Amino acid sequence: MSVDGAALMVGIRTIAKWHPMDVNLVIEGETEANINVSNMTVYKNPFVAGDMYYNKCVNRCDGKLSVGLVEGISKMKLLKLIPALYNGTALDKEGTRYFECEWLELQTDHEVVIEMDGEIVGRPPARYTILKHALKTVIG
């Protein structure tokens, strides 16, 4: 099975089981309380999996995180977002939003896991930050 086929199957299976949850987001010190969320992606690379990607460009050197948020929408609307991930227009759809920030904290009482690049790394609360110019690359 291709990477795209596997990602699509996992996405559909996850949507079938998932229920939106209420979260508090602290974005650079400002709190947005009781937001009903289906999905939140914090990224520095617009590619999700296989050929899926977000259409919001990111500057990898600006010290800011890109955040794509899908509000608590119906399972049918979530399923309809899948094709938009393949043509890069998911964050233009109703019920989604995009923002950039230097740091972000996710707070919730729901029992969920935090997944990063396919690995389960913990449970909320979660704080996301980025260190500007922290990685030095030597070529040659």
List where the protein language model places each region.
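Long C-terminal subdomains/extensions of small-metabolite kinases
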Residues: M1-G140
